């Protein structure tokens, strides 16, 4: 484990003074009493601040709404899970038997939460300036690529605005299935749009994420027309 953590620390670009903090950040609540949820809470707040400050300086002419949408894009689950895969965090996670069996080391929500927990752990092990430097390095490519615009809006918002612009009825969303235990549920939602006369399905770790997935499928169809 020590050798593995040394490798991980090289990958994330930070050497812990208190390795126990890193170990805790990698521990899912299904595996132990001392898990990473409190670190995740802290890391989420710090990440939002770091990204908000970076965007504030990078886009001096953008308004609050544009900055908020760009920040949401950069701190959302898929972006964090992508970082986790770059660091191969799935190889280091401590999971309970149930999560191991269900492939929790690949689940985006668990990977994203772990990235936030590591940020929280780094902040406790060092200081805000050091944490900011590390996180900005992780986000170097994303911060260079991101631009304000409609593409920063989430799929549900974009779909609603598209339909409103054409004076069409808004979509309806219904949960059709919930699988798994309370701490690792998967929601399946159907979305119906009257003028298309088709039902689209989406799945996710929450109802909101499932609705977003379904809306994204409809948008892909509309953009092909």
From Swiss-Prot:
Digests double-stranded RNA. Involved in the processing of primary rRNA transcript to yield the immediate precursors to the large and small rRNAs (23S and 16S). Also processes some mRNAs, and tRNAs when they are encoded in the rRNA operon. CRISPR (clustered regularly interspaced short palindromic repeat) is an adaptive immune system that provides protection against mobile genetic elements (viruses, transposable elements and conjugative plasmids). CRISPR clusters contain spacers, sequences complementary to antecedent mobile elements, and target invading nucleic acids. CRISPR clusters are transcribed and processed into CRISPR RNA (crRNA). In this organism endogenous ribonuclease 3 and Cas9 are required for correct coprocessing of pre-crRNA and the trans-encoded small RNA (tracrRNA). Mg(2+) binds at residues 40, 113, 116. Homodimer. Transmembrane segments: none annotated. It comes from Pasteurella multocida (strain Pm70). Its main location: cytoplasm. Its cofactor is Mg(2+). Residues 5-127 form the RNase III domain. HAMAP family: RNase_III (MF_00104). It catalyses: Endonucleolytic cleavage to 5'-phosphomonoester. It comes from the Bacteria. The keyword rRNA-binding applies. GO terms for biological process: mRNA processing; regulation of gene expression; rRNA processing; tRNA processing. This is Ribonuclease 3. The keyword Cytoplasm applies. PANTHER family: RIBONUCLEASE 3 (PTHR11207:SF0), RIBONUCLEASE III (PTHR11207). Belongs to the ribonuclease III family.
